[in-house]
Structure formats: structure tokens, C-alpha cells
Amino acid sequence: MKRPGKRWLWLIPCVLALAVGLFLLLRSCAASLSAPAPSAALLQAADGLDEIVLQAAFLPESRSLRVTQRMALTSRVDDARDTLVLRTWPNAYQSMETSPLTLTELYDAAYPEGFSTGALVMEEATVAHGDGAAEKVFYRYTDTAKTVLSLPLAQSWGCGETLTVTLRYTLMLPKAASRYGVMNGVYAVGNAFPLPALYENGAYRTDDYSPIGDPFVSECANFSLELTLPDGYQCAATSFPSETRQDGEKQVMTFSAPAVRDFALVLSQQFQAVQAMEGNVLVSVYAPDGNWARQALAFARAALRCYNELYGDYPYPSLTLTGSTLPYDGAEYPGLCLLSSSLTGDELEKAAAHEVAHQWWYAIVGSDSVNNAWQDEALSQFSALSYWERAHGAAARAEWYEQEIAPSLRITLNATAGAPLSWFSSLGEYKSLVYDRGTALLCAADELLGGRMNDFLRLYRERCAFGMASRQDFLSLLTEYSGEDFTPLFEDYLDTLITP
């Protein structure tokens, strides 16, 4: 056998270069930067909030997560209550009759393989009053969809008193392109963990899981999660993991998210991750397509930079976006934006701008997305318009307005922009009224304010951060800011049917 001559030596550096390149490529597919620590302002906002501690094991082979959830909930209302009500949204996915994805406009895209069942299978619930011992609770569901979980209390729950609630359950994900489901190797876990139902006017809110809009209303709390998942999976979440350690063939990730309204996550083996710091915020994008992820990262950073300047600094240490299979453009969670991976070019940039704006108008400033959906959707769309003007010029903004927003003022529909979600008969109707006509209202108010609407929105953010703002709160603050009564204008755009 002949020995290779020197002419083969040139291959050695090539092979080494190839190996280094492959190593760097594989390294680029995983997140490598870390998020900064929470700011003093965020920790101040988190002080005294309810605590929600989650331990979850992700089991991809069964499309499930096994969860233990512990909540320390303090009553802040005068009423003494004898029940605690939690919202268990995943149960709506159990049947065709209750799934939010069976709307005609969504079904084929959401269930390409046919209907698939999802659920939250409750195993045990215990409640402790104050420092007392935990007692098992015989819970019951009070609605057909099993999204309203009622826990009877052994003694009344008074103002200032704390309950410690412990739940054990399994989340079962449907095969569905959705905010809650599995499709193309991407596992979306949104609106999954049980949260206290909003309590107002002497009663718990028990809104239906509407297939239109975002029927989820919750107050800020401090979340933490310890997630066990198989090697090879990456996790995009409401916060960036503060620690990742190895446990045999599994990873254990630890997350902490102070002062947020919910905690969501998206997992996949196929994700490529790209990251960059934008000021003091770690911006990450996870998507199967690396080029798509890099585009989305650029758009997210630009939008974040714009809104920081317009509305005040984003308060959380991280902002994460994912490329997911969705039957709509996107979905928002605190610190996490889900975007349809089918979006490209201008449509991707507009969707990213809109979803990032939701970090101000939903995540930071909460509102009633069931009865006043315009208050986060129209504000986010108006913010995206402002971003579009900064990024592409006044003519580009005017073109967007004329093509997508102005037509909503000329069409006749059987609902109004200020209507509750149950009034809308289709996604198209909802978009035309809530997004477009709602944005037209804000543009009209901006004109009356001499172009100062974004200055007002900055004040709105300052006054209402981490709370829940009503329509009247918005109007009252606008009157205080401007010295004018905008009620007639709002009633015209939000409450008046356009007739032929």
C-alpha cells in the first residue's frame, strides 16, 4: 500500500477549517448570550405581587407536559369569597364544539390532518389558608368547555389574606397549528397554565374561549419555571433561562419572570437561534429557518428601539420571537411574540412591529381584551404605523393607511369597533373594525392633538404600567392631557354602526 505523498497535505488545513466552520454553525443554532438581571424598576413593580411557581417536564413523544404548579394568591378585594376560580383554557381543545380553531376561517389551516384533541388533565388540587395545612379540594368545572375551574374553600377568603394553591396536572397538546398545539415539530404552549379568573363587580369573569381575538384577561404576577426537557430541544419563553444544567440525557432550564400577565413557551428540535443586545435587552429569535430568524431579529430590534424612544423603556431583560406554524399572523405574550413563519418581507416586518408593540399595549399596560379589544389591538397597530413612518418615511405610512385602514371607514358591518368579542362573526370583520377602524380613531385623535398622540401614549404607559386600564381610564387621561373632551369622537368611531 502506497503512503500518501506531500501533495495530500493541503487537505489538512481544509479539513480543519471545515471542522471549525461546522462547529461554529452548530454553535450558532443554539442561544449563547445571556439576559441581564432584572432592573430595580422591574423588581419594584414586582414587589408584593402574587407568586406562581411552575415545575414542568416536557414529554415530546406524548405531546405533553407534566406540571406541578404552586400559587401564593393574596385577596385585594373587599368581598369575602368562598370559592377560587381558575381559567383552564387548554380544555377548550377537547372537542369540535368548544375548540377555538373550528371557526371556518381557521379550521383547514389549524387542523391540516383533521381534528386533534388537547386538554388539561387535572390530577389534584390542594389549598392552604395562610400558614395552615394544605387540604385537598374537590374541584368542579362550571362550563361546558371545562375552562372555568371552581375550587370551594373551607373558610372564607378575606381581603389581605393569602391562599397557597397547589395543582398537579398534565397538559396534552393537540396536533394543531395554534398558540396551543404541535405542528411541524414546533410545540407551542400558550395560555396553558391555570390562572386566577379576574374578579370584578363582585363576581369572577367566566368569558368563553372565543375563536376571535384574545379572550385572556389577567393581572401581573411573578412567575418562575423549572423545565425539564430532552437534549436537543430549545425553548423560547416569556423570559430567558437564568440557568441551564445537564441532568443525564435531559436539560433543566430555570426561568424567572417578574411582573408579567402570563407565561408561555415554544419548544423545538428544529430551532435555529439568533440573538443580539438592543440596549439593555437581549433580543432572541428562534425559527427553523436561520435566514428568516435573522430578518425577524432585525425588525424586532428596530421596533424595540423605536418604541423605547416613543413610549418609554421596555422593562423586561429579554424579548423573544419565534417562527411558528400559525393560522394567523401572530400571537402576543409577555416577553414573547409568536409569528407565522410563512410571513416574509413587508408582511413580516409589519407583523413584528405590531406584536412587539403589544409589549407596551397588553404586557405593560393591561386592558380588557374581551370587551375593549381595540384598547390593545388598535394601539399596537397605531404604534406599528409610527414605526413604519420612522423606518420607511411619511409616504410609506400614508400608503399603509390608505390601503389598509381607510377602507374600514367605508364598509358596512353588523358590529362596531368597541364591541365585545362575542359580537364579531368573522376574523375579517374583527380585523376591519378593531384593528383598522380602531387605528383610524387614534389617527383622527392624533390629528386633533397636533401630532402628539405618541406623547400621550407615553404618559398613558407611565400612569398605567403593570395595571389594568379601562376605556374610561384612557379617555379621562386623554382629557387631562389635552384639556379636551374626546368622548364624542370615541363614540363615533367605536360605538356607531356605519349604515349604507
Give, region by region, the residue ranges found by the protein language model:
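Short beta-strand elements of extracellular/lumenal beta-sandwich folds
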Residues: 63-76
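N-terminal, polar/Ser/Thr-rich
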Residues: 7-66
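Hydrophobic helix-coil surface modules that form long, contiguous segments used
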Residues: 214-353
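Solvent-exposed beta-hairpin/edge-strand motifs
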Residues: 81-132, 228, 232
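Extended, low-hydrophobicity, Ser/Thr/Pro/Gly-biased non-transmembrane segments
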Residues: 70, 108-123, 140-141, 147, ...
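Zinc-dependent metallopeptidase catalytic helix centered on the HExxH motif
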Residues: 294, 338-403
